[in-house]
Amino acid sequence: MPVISMKQLLEAGVHFGHQTRRWNPKMKKYIFTERNGIYIIDLQKTVKKVDEAFNFMREVASDNGTILFVGTKKQAQESVRDEAIRSGQYFVNHRWLGGTLTNFETIQKRIQHLKKIEKMEADGTFEVLPKKEVVLLKKEQEKLERFLGGIKDMKGLPDALFIVDPRKERIAVAEARKLHIPIIGIVDTNCDPDEIDYVIPANDDAIRAVKLLTAKMADAIIEVNQGEELTEAEVAPVEEKAAEETTEA
């Protein structure tokens, strides 16, 4: 049974593509028809592709891999942040800083600087510094948190990227491809699907559509993690019983 239904996709407006004059011919195989100058995405193919992406997400999570959610357009910012946090992963939902992946060491230095400022605020250093200096530090903290807050606890390069609108996030796509990091992407009719390993043909402009698909990818990770928790919960009583029996013997 598919992980997402046609009804859910229709209700969220996933089938609405871009205007016919704004399209990438490589997306032709994912287009069902054209209506009033707008391409309509073939949702049967979307259902299948969501399944493939979902299963890949599960694989990554099963190997304790990390996934970086990326979506800096307004329609994606909230979903990307919320679903990454819900699934215990990482996110970039404002500007993608060039070198986030390809120059990870430098980015890590900026993150360390952010953590240093946070520590200064927490341990009371701000209270003994001149007001002007504190204002500047807070401004810097705010800026760094905005761009790097979603990855400040990411210890190394991610094992996969989930991207909303690869056309907008072309720098992130280029960096991931250079480092051979697999990409799952919500790909609209104006995007190049060849750059994405797991294409989800869908409307990337409607908030509901983005939310539905991003949440579904997060669900894949959560399912795996909850499964592990259940297994541990089931194993614990068995181990306790075995220990008791050994003691009695």
Curated annotation (Swiss-Prot):
InterPro entries: Ribosomal_uS2 (IPR001865), Ribosomal_uS2_bac/mit/plastid (IPR005706), Ribosomal_uS2_CS (IPR018130), Ribosomal_uS2_flav_dom_sf (IPR023591). This is Small ribosomal subunit protein uS2. Keywords: Ribonucleoprotein, Ribosomal protein. One of its GO terms (biological process) is translation. One of its GO terms (molecular function) is structural constituent of ribosome. The gene is rpsB. Belongs to the universal ribosomal protein uS2 family. It comes from Listeria innocua serovar 6a (strain ATCC BAA-680 / CLIP 11262). GO terms for cellular component: cytosolic small ribosomal subunit. It comes from the Bacteria.
